[in-house]
From Swiss-Prot:
Residues 1-25 form the signal peptide. Its main location: secreted. It comes from Aplysia californica. This is Abdominal ganglion neuropeptide L11. GO terms for biological process: neuropeptide signaling pathway.
Amino acid sequence: MPCTPNSHRLLLVTALCLLITSLFAQQKRRPRIDCTRFVFAPACRGVSAKRALDPRAVTLDENVAPSFSDLDDEILRSFLAYNRHKQQEQAAPRPDAPSSLLRLVAQRGLRHRTPHSLHRPVPWSVEQSFLKTGSDGALSWPNSIKSLQED
């Protein structure tokens, strides 16, 4: 059977279609660069590269990535233990804040300005009976101590 010009054209068009299809198929099969490992690769740099990157290429493969389920469980257990400890600590009775403050001030001493030094400790001791108790049960400072605090 002799070849006609129409059959040559049909064969040429079919070959071109197959060639173009195979090129697109190879382009899709080309492995993407893992930007988590190769951060300085040209495809991984710049804002436009980040926008053009396929989100599926960024996700970690389950077979390669280690399993963190044990670590997650351990973190959850430690958080629950910490939370239980904090709740027990908050439920425990606390010492009165004014007496704790008074002990701290008594240990450190009051500081006031003098002509010789800006801050000089003045040791003093406080007894609970020395403080005045208001109608609401709160402790208040005597006037002599208030004058030292204002200086």
